[in-house]
């Protein structure tokens, strides 16, 4: 699963996920893309599950790019532990997603195959997404 190799600090504050994606919002590598319309968090497990769904569908053909990386640690306190006594330990990592962010890209396959692969991947994600075709000259 995806997670940072090392971090300067183990824990991070919650923060607020606001605004729209101004970077990483265009198809840059492939011909087709899966773009987020909604806002939220994607865990490393969700990113991997969607990648597997796409890879299985396109079989040997094509190439997939993952345009997001889970770099924010989410901490949890153990069950039945009293309040206080500091912050919990990091349990998993998430990627904060703003509307307009490109999540995955694909190349080397037909549009129908890419559309179906992205539909299967989108079913694994807790966000609303849309299918994007690269525009010429963009």
UniProtKB/Swiss-Prot annotation:
Compositionally biased residues, Basic residues: 1-13
CDD domains named among the record's database cross-references: Ribosomal_L16_L10e
Any one Gene Ontology cellular component term annotated for this protein: cytosolic large ribosomal subunit
Keywords, ordered alphabetically: Ribonucleoprotein, Ribosomal protein, RNA-binding, rRNA-binding, tRNA-binding
Record's keyword annotation contains tRNA-binding: yes
GO molecular function: rRNA binding; structural constituent of ribosome; tRNA binding
Pfam families on file: Ribosomal_L16
GO biological process terms on file: translation
Region of interest called Disordered, as start-end residue ranges on this chain: 1-20
Keyword rRNA-binding: yes
Protein family (similarity comment): Belongs to the universal ribosomal protein uL16 family.
Free-text function comment from the UniProt entry: Binds 23S rRNA and is also seen to make contacts with the A and possibly P site tRNAs.
Description of how the protein assembles with itself and partners: Part of the 50S ribosomal subunit.
Protein name: Large ribosomal subunit protein uL16
Organism: Paraburkholderia xenovorans (strain LB400)
Phylogenetic lineage: Bacteria, Pseudomonadati, Pseudomonadota, Betaproteobacteria, Burkholderiales
